[in-house]
Amino acid sequence: MGSGNTGLSTALKLKKDGHKVCLFELEEFSESSKHLSEELNLIFENQTDKLNLDLVTNNIDEALDFSKIIILCVPAYAHKGFGNALSHKITKDHIAVLMPGTLGSLELRNILEKNNSEIPIIGE
């Protein structure tokens, strides 16, 4: 989750390593992800790989149905927005990892608890 520098580079590295990858972005930041369904280039130490992500979406339900492992690659100021988007959608069967952590796991857990949501495994 998150289509900025860290989110996109993490998604492409996971795709290069053979994983199925969904990239989710909040609707208010969707400008940064609207062209990401096209072929993308990952350039790493003089090697260029052409990659396609499996799913690029602004629909939280699609993203959570796609994978039980969620990597939130967003700055600290975005934790609240993503926490609210995940509320009543995420389940205890999911695993949420925050990158970078900055104790965002505590904030995410508090948001989910406040919204009476299920609490997944949360890590940083």
Across the structure, where does each feature detected by a protein language model lie?
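NAD(P)+-binding Rossmann beta1-loop-alpha1 motif at the extreme N-terminus of oxidoreductases
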Residues: 1-45
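A generic structural signal for alpha->beta connector loops
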Residues: 18-20, 52-53, 93, 119
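Charged/polar, solvent-exposed surface patches and flexible loops
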Residues: 35, 65, 110
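N-terminal glycine-rich dinucleotide-binding loop that anchors FAD/FMN and/or NAD(P) in oxidoreductases
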Residues: 37-58, 123
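Rossmann-like NAD(P)(H) cofactor-binding subdomain of soluble oxidoreductases
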Residues: 76-124
